[in-house]
Amino acid sequence: MNSKIRRILGIIFFALITLLFLDFTGAIHTWFGWMAKIQFLPAVLALNFGVVIGLVLLTLLMGRIYCSVICPLGVLQDIFGWFGKKAKKNRYTYSKPLSILRYVMLGVLVVALVAGFTSIGALIAPYSAFGRIASTFLAPVYQMGNNLLASWAESMDSYAFYSVDIWWKGGITFVVALVTLVALFVLAFKNGRTYCNTICPVGTVLGFLSRYSYLKPVIDTTKCNGCGLCARNCKASCIDSKNHAIDYSRCVVCLDCIDKCRQGAIKYVPRAKASQSAPSGASADKGRRAFIAGTAMVAGASVAKAQKLKMDGGYAVIEDKKIPNRETPLTPPGSLSARNLAQHCTACQLCISACPNQVLRPSGDLSNFMQPVTSFERGYCRPECVKCSEVCPTGAIKPITKEEKTAIQIGHAVWIADNCVVNRDNEKCDNCFRHCPTGAIQMVAKNPDDKKSPKIPVINTERCIGCGACENLCPSRPFSAIYVEGHEVHREI
């Protein structure tokens, strides 16, 4: 492994993971969806022990290579740092580790997991932060480019491309993503991997393991002349050139120091060959090790325990629909329950980006902050679509088949008589009846004694699956006359 190979691998991973959040066709996920599932925190929440063990072994073998290659937020910081390097070369300096801050941030994540507020802890989780940045800022640009290409192709009588809607997913997520992006840019532009070594809880855990990695960058004191060039180019600020020491808990194995050393005094070699190197600049005491091990055990135990406007034929004024006041929020099919979603979802926004019907959006409620909730102002949850269950890397939305989805009831339809155009405007309407995919809605005479009286909908809640077709296609504005009330725990019909 050298820095060039590391950069190439990092760019490949970064590009493909980014495309997972940008692609609206589903083609990218078919081939590269596994890249989301090998992210550390999603793998832990999904209890994907194979991936977790694999990442632990990789770290024990090569150090924090995960942070330089697999983690998209790490590569994004390297991109920001590259701009900083263009502004000023040799700008880094060695700094002492901010261990207390690192442990506090890890503790915040653990407490959030224990309390079931996974999305709150996900505010500082690397994969989730990157997902919000990609889906909020990069996806609209990608979609605009696609629409321009589709428009040009159409002018050439080609329909190889199609336009997609670009919609506002919510102000809260935008603000959080913007603050995260700006903070990361400032930190990385000035100081390289500050986030990774002070805030990122994944970096803290892997940093503990990397102290004992088999392969390490080692300083050969017989060749080193103490020029400090390696330290001034270390993005992790972990090389103490005066004492010929490297803090392996913060080293992200970028291997830039090896490229910069003119004396060839730094090698990436097995631990057994490190006899000529100075001791690590940040040796861990037993208290710190116990703290990390303890919090890891608590986290593992808690996770294991937790486990466009529509034309309506002139029936109503054309205006945007408003979200009904649901007593129980709707969660996506496959999420099992509101609790399961809250305890496993990292609010990465991948399911929201992948939803072709635009029914998923980030929640603003503290209990499920930025996690997906189902709403039907822009579309409805088509029975044949299982995209969200296919892309979720954490198990917050379990994989389900199309057949299984048709038997999952995430909620049931409720009719509001005062909002219905039949009652309010004395107009004939049977939109909900005609579009219900399960036949759960029947039309009956408003006046049982007069068969010619206007017909109103009657809902069979035993057949309704809560897809929202009735709510979405209802011509009543601003509130639909029929809406879906959610279930805390999904039911099978």
PLM features: residue spans?
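Non-ligating segments of multi-cofactor redox enzymes
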Residues: 1-244, 249-250, 256-493
